[in-house]
């Protein structure tokens, strides 16, 4: 699949899903969050272990068509941070975002970098949970995955989403700034011919 073949799903589909989830009963949302306690969150695993799990679980997505076939769709165009680098193109699996569960083998988002030849290169994964849901189910305990703490994105934000916790894992392209930082200094949106955020 090339960059031009990628269709950005309308942002309202993600926002609509968020609003539907917010209207769900608080009890069922809390139950979904608290019933999915993994040893992943309890263990203080070395960073390499999380990277290995992410690589093993996303290897098939080097072909973006397989990611699309499994429910991932492009949201937000290509996310650029100017001097700090970029986050690339986020292919979001909305049902995984809305289930409120964190599993290192099932990332909510897979991330691609647009290449000059028009192809997309898998560079990482992103785990995301909405802050209100997480904080309600786990008061005073920010999310972590295999010992890696998530970052909080407050609202309002550039994505138009409610506050959320996120953890980028640059498993397929080494990041000189760190494996789990939000921005990748070596990623660019220059080859993307759509909307750059």
Which residue ranges define each predicted feature?
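Bacterial N-terminal signal peptides
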Residues: 13-23
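N-terminal secretory signal peptides that target proteins for export/translocation
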Residues: 1-9
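Low-complexity, intrinsically disordered regions enriched in charged/polar residues
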Residues: 8-9, 13-14, 44, 48
């Amino acid at each position: 699949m090339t960059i031009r073949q990628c269709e950005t799903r309308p942002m309202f589909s993600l926002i609509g899903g968020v609003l539907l989830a917010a209207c769900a009963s608080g009890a069922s949302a809390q139950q979904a969050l608290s019933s999915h306690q993994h040893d992943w969150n309890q263990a203080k695993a070395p960073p390499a272990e999380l990277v290995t799990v992410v690589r093993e679980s996303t290897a098939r997505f080097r072909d973006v068509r397989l990611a699309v076939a499994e429910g991932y769709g492009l949201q937000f165009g290509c996310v650029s941070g100017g001097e700090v680098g970029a986050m690339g193109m986020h292919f979001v699996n909305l049902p995984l975002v809305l289930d409120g569960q964190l599993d290192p083998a099932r990332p909510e988002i897979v991330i691609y970098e647009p290449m000059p030849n028009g192809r997309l290169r898998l560079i990482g994964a992103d785990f995301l949970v909405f802050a209100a849901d997480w904080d309600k189910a786990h008061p005073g305990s920010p999310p972590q995955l295999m010992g890696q703490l998530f970052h909080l994105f407050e609202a309002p934000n550039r994505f138009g989403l409610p506050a959320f916790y996120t953890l980028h894992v640059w498993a397929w392209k080494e990041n000189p700034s760190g494996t789990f930082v939000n921005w990748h200094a070596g990623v660019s949106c220059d080859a993307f011919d759509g909307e750059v955020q």
